[in-house]
Amino acid sequence: MDIRAAEISAILKSQIANFGEEAAVSDVGQVLSVGDGIARIYGLDNVQAGEMVEFPKAGVKGMALNLERDNVGAVIFGQDQAIKEGDEVRRLGEIVDVPVGRGLLGRVVNPLGEPIDGKGPIVSTERRRVDVKAPGIIPRKSVHEPVQTGLKSIDTLIPVGRGQRELIIGDRQTGKTAVAIDTILNQKAANAGTDESAKLYCVYVAIGQKRSTVAQIVKTLEEHGALEYTIVVVASASEPAPLQYLAPFSGCAMGEWFRDNGLHGLIIYDDLSKQAVAYRQMSLLLRRPPGREAYPGDVFYLHSRLLERAAKLNEDNGSGSLTALPIIETQANDVSAYIPTNVISITDGQIFLETDLFYQGIRPAVNVGISVSRVGSSAQIKAMKQVAGAIKGELAQYREMAAFAKFGSDLDASTQKLLARGERLTELLKQPQYAPQAVEEQVCVIYAGTRGYLDNIPTSSVRRFESELLARLHSQHKDLLDNIRTKKALDKDLENTLKSVLDNFSATFA
């Protein structure tokens, strides 16, 4: 093999000429062990808690959660099959963040903010950290504007205000998601207008659900024209636990963008029980000490720091709001389990859905006796307060009397009247799915129920009475509905008009 000196010197000269003094320094570690979505890493001495790390060989990212003396425990945001012992791990020097802004509306994304709907890349210029501190006391204002769910039983008895956290709790298959989806659909009219203060942008976070279920929900939103003002964040049942844990925080960061820009957001977490289970799995695999029901000690903090980010801000901070509707699934109506009691104590009220009511055909299956809204009544519009004040007491009396009436003893006339009224009001509060009602329609219908217009018609005809009354109002008395909507109160003139409409209608109803 002949060695040409000229060639060698030319190569050396070019290498010397191209030699740069700058050197890239990166903090690198090695994988000690990996499995179940958790990696133990040696090295990375300067990594921060909650910092993103990268596994370049496998092309996935993770987050450092446990900083121990001799190793770092990291959760992996993706499949861990491609990661092997001894693989290189790099610090990214950043905390988990996601894209935010209007560009996400109408899109379906994963918890890292990457699109999964096949509609191309997300158009967004701004990114936000997923886990930030909730607003303090000074920037906040008390809840005073309503969130209209479009469901009579909720808007009349358990009203929700903008900036509130209202828990939806019940067993599986009791219609929890249906209540949340109807609330999104009911915002269509407000979001179609030009008044930004009336609009409510929605974020739906699906945690640990079947992909087919999520696809059906997205299809429903699309068919009803509601997807255009909604962001859907999905961590399905087949995703690793760290992504199911991250999804609510990602959705919240997207919703907070609306709140902090003087707009109004609504976020639905469906459901937080599955996030708690995912967090329990991660914590146990990271060898953190278990507590009650094997959940880690900070599972309360997990939910409180998430739900405290829903707030109504004052004028100095843009008057924006973020309303949260967390969903919790119970086992056999047991609301005294660990996670349900935690979330009940964090939220500003709860809507209880019961299996028994659901199978009796009372849908939405809201138990109005034990459901409460701690701050929503101050957000209710005056017209609704005027007509719904009586219904609460009457339904409470009806439930008490109905329990005694089971014994079959002879009932006096006043008790029979009370039972008859209660039956009709219960029937009146029933509502089919995907058929939310505008607040002015609800006011007219509830007025008819509480003022005795239904007392003389059979219970089976209540639904027909309602639909025909609304048809009459829309065809002949549109101005009455418009006035209730704009004035938000029933003054003497409006009440007299409504009375005469109802008198004429009930005289002809048969």
UniProtKB/Swiss-Prot annotation:
Query: Positions of the site: Required for activity?
Result: S371
Enzyme Commission number(s) from the entry: 7.1.2.2
Molecular function (GO) terms for this protein are: ADP binding; ATP binding; proton-transporting ATP synthase activity, rotational mechanism
Q: Where does ATP bind?
A: G170, D171, R172, Q173, T174, G175, K176, T177
Keywords in alphabetical order = ATP synthesis, ATP-binding, Cell inner membrane, Cell membrane, CF(1), Hydrogen ion transport, Ion transport, Membrane, Nucleotide-binding, Translocase, Transport
User: What is the protein's membrane topology class?
Assistant: Peripheral membrane protein
Q: What's the name of the protein?
A: ATP synthase subunit alpha
Q: What is the lineage of its organism?
A: Bacteria, Pseudomonadati, Pseudomonadota, Alphaproteobacteria, Caulobacterales
Q: Which gene underlies this protein?
A: atpA
